[in-house]
From Swiss-Prot:
The active site is at E204, K349. Catalyzes the reversible conversion of 2-phosphoglycerate (2-PG) into phosphoenolpyruvate (PEP). It is essential for the degradation of carbohydrates via glycolysis. PANTHER family: ENOLASE. Binds a second Mg(2+) ion via substrate during catalysis. It catalyses: (2R)-2-phosphoglycerate = phosphoenolpyruvate + H2O. GO terms for biological process: glycolytic process. It is found in: Cytoplasm; Secreted; Cell surface. It comes from Chlorobium limicola (strain DSM 245 / NBRC 103803 / 6330). This is Enolase. Keywords: Cytoplasm, Glycolysis, Lyase, Magnesium, Metal-binding, Secreted. Belongs to the enolase family. Its cofactor is Mg(2+).
């Protein structure tokens, strides 16, 4: 019987050198290990990441309290449970915490346990994790959102918007799409060097040069696509119709430059201009007309529901509008967004909500209501590649896991290559059909 015998946590370091939680789950016949990611630009509605707060140790970012919660309270509660009963395990974790935002035990403690249990369950059944979670129909490799140029909170430069990404849609296989992304990444590096610009990378592996404007950033990415020998879409392609091979995705992380007191979007790092919600929506409308943009994440601030509605009404029929800080992988927040008819996609970050079951529920709710789901990493990552497995398990069709550098990002891309190989002829790459616009 796959009965949980021991749950053991430890403090390890993430890709930014900050402490995070790693959990091992042991049964008589199987073992699972999971490491928890951490964000830089976090939404105020996210589940609580429990930190120690001792400024003299890891600058207050230690996670020994969360580790202790796993090794005592959670270990005692889960011992004797069947590791294959994922929903029961996650329900037990939620009951142990008892708070709406996981502030008692910490979402970082709960998530590590939840994912490690899933891995131990998969090992017990002899199935890969994507098959264990998703069943026999799990066969869709995701279109990657590759973050090749960074700004905002992810970089020390003059670019307001956090992520400029490429999406290789005009390919029949994931491996070909990955090659396209890698070649564009190297073309962009060469282009930046030729212009005397920095090729230092940000937290997620994208370049972070000092540029004159946000417009220069997106234009450099488009130039790199052509330099690599690929065809960027046109603004009228609407999801890659025609001969487009690559489209652009953005994550401005607008909550980071929204002044709630002024109710203005303030471009602090570049032009210093201040925009109302209507003006910000019109700004994105113009960009969607001028550039081959297929997806915008957090185009408006997390609590600017009015702004989100304006933006959705303006371009939601032709651009994927992804809610990250808006929805925070939370089914209740997503349900509110569906009711208000804002956005048309949800970003899925497992540590925003804290358990695998709640993550899968959010994805299911999105799909049932015609929203797409984008499985995502965090800026503080580890070598753990669970999100690659979840992307295939749920047939999400899209994944956001950084640039073509830094091994913490490449671990996810390489895991998807292995899954594609394992699926062999069953593997599907959706390309432009991953979008519903």
């Amino acid at each position: 019987m796959p009965i949980i015998r021991k749950v053991l946590a430890r403090q390890i370091l993430d890709s930014r050198g900050n402490p995070t939680v790693e959990v091992d789950v042991y049964t008589e016949n199987s073992f699972g290990r999971a490491a928890v990611p951490s964000g830089a630009s976090t939404g105020i509605h996210e589940a609580v990441e429990l930190r120690d707060g001792d400024a003299g140790i890891y600058l207050g970012k230690g996670v020994l309290k969360a580790v202790d919660n796993v090794n005592t309270v959670i270990n005692d509660a889960l011992k004797g449970m069947l590791v294959t009963e994922q929903e029961e395990i996650d329900e037990a974790l939620l009951a142990l915490d008892g708070t709406p935002n996981k502030s008692k035990l910490g979402a970082n403690a709960l998530l590590g346990v939840s994912l490690a249990c899933a891995k131990a369950g998969a090992e017990y059944t002899g199935l890969p994790l994507f098959r264990y979670i998703g069943g026999t129909m799990a066969n869709t490799l995701p279109v990657p959102m590759m973050n090749v140029l960074n700004g905002g909170a992810h970089a020390d430069n003059t670019v307001d918007f956090q992520e400029f990404m490429i999406m290789p849609i005009g390919f029949s296989s994931y491996s070909d799409a990955l090659r396209c992304g890698a070649e564009i990444f190297h073309a962009l590096k060469s282009l930046l060097k030729s212009k005397g610009l920095s090729t230092a990378v940000g937290d997620e592996g994208g370049f972070a040069p000092n540029l004159r404007s946000n417009e220069e950033a997106i234009e450099l990415v488009i130039e790199a696509i052509g330099k690599a020998g690929y065809k960027a879409g046109s603004p009228t392609d609407k999801g890659g119709l025609g001969e487009a091979q690559v489209m652009i995705a953005l994550d401005p992380a607008s909550s980071e430059f929204y002044d709630s007191a002024k109710k203005r979007y303030v471009f602090k790092k570049s032009s210093k201009q201040e925009l109302t919600s209507l003006e910000m929506a019109e700004y994105w409308e113009k960009w969607a007309s001028d550039y081959p943009i297929i997806s915008i994440e957090d185009g408006m601030a997390e609590d600017d529901w009015e702004g989100w509605k304006i933006l959705t009404d303006k371009i939601g029929s032709r651009v994927q509008l992804v809610g990250d800080d808006l929805f925070v992988t939370n089914s209740k927040r997503l349900a509110e967004g569906i009711e208000r008819r804002v956005g048309n996609s949800i970003l899925i970050k497992v540590n925003q909500i804290g358990t695998l079951t709640e993550t899968l529920q959010a994805i299911d709710l999105a799909k049932r209501n015609g929203y797409t789901a984008v499985i995502s990493h965090r800026s503080g990552e580890t070598e753990d590649s669970t999100i690659a497995q979840i992307a295939v398990a749920t047939n999400a069709g899209q994944i956001k896991t950084g640039s073509m550098s830094r091994s913490d990002r490449m671990a996810k891309y390489n895991e998807l290559l292995r899954i594609e190989e394992e699926l062999c002829g069953q593997a599907k790459y959706p390309g432009a059909s991953a979008f519903r616009v």
